[in-house]
Amino acid sequence: MSLPSNVYESIHRAWMGDTLEGLKDFIRIPAKSRAFNPNWESDGILKRTLEDSAEWGRRLLPCAEFEIIEKPGIPPALFIRIPTAGGHKGKPAFFYGHLDKQPEPEGWSEGLGPWTPVVRDGRLYGRGGVDDGYNYYLTLTAVKALEEAGAAHPEIFCLFETDEESGSRDLARYIQELAPRI
């Protein structure tokens, strides 16, 4: 399937605008995975990360459904359902990613830090911007670009967990519980 050239233009425009700003906001949150933050449940940082991400996603894709799934003692996850568009009549697609981070290392170059997003020479620096935080923003931006171009896409389900950096101990449980809805 070839895509209209305006899809790529739309992605580039979004990436340099709202998507980049959303990713910068994500970098600012020290959303360390539970293995690195024993207070993850009481401090609410992982949940806040999902709330902020869902808010950004709702602005981008108002037709999508965003649900934060919480269970005591288990890091929260964000489940998303994006309705089919353009009359697509195929099987649904499933995207996975994570929005938790490893601890901040030492040794940042001058002017850079883990929780301070900086664009330098066309590159974005900050903790979580490449492993795997960008995935959330890229996935939703790509779907939006398809819709703006009038391209068809299947129903899309996404699961973004906050425990990948600690081994994804509860990922199988989340997928099993969500399977009837996918």
Predicted regions and their residues:
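Short alpha-helical patches at coil-to-helix transitions and adjacent helical residues
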Residues: 50, 132-136, 168
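Short, small-residue-enriched loops and turns at beta-alpha junctions
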Residues: 42-43, 133, 163-166
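Predominant activation on well-ordered alpha-helical scaffold segments within soluble catalytic domains
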Residues: 24, 54, 137-140, 144, ...
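Active-site metal-coordination/substrate-binding segment of hydrolases
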Residues: 89-160
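N-terminal helical capping/dimerization or prosegment-like subdomains
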Residues: 2-105
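Gly/Ser/Thr-rich beta-alpha loop segments that engage phosphate groups in nucleotides
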Residues: 32, 128-130, 169
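Secondary-structure boundary motif
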Residues: 59, 145-149, 176-180
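Histidine/acidic-residue-rich, glycine-tolerant segments that coordinate divalent metal ions
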Residues: 153-182
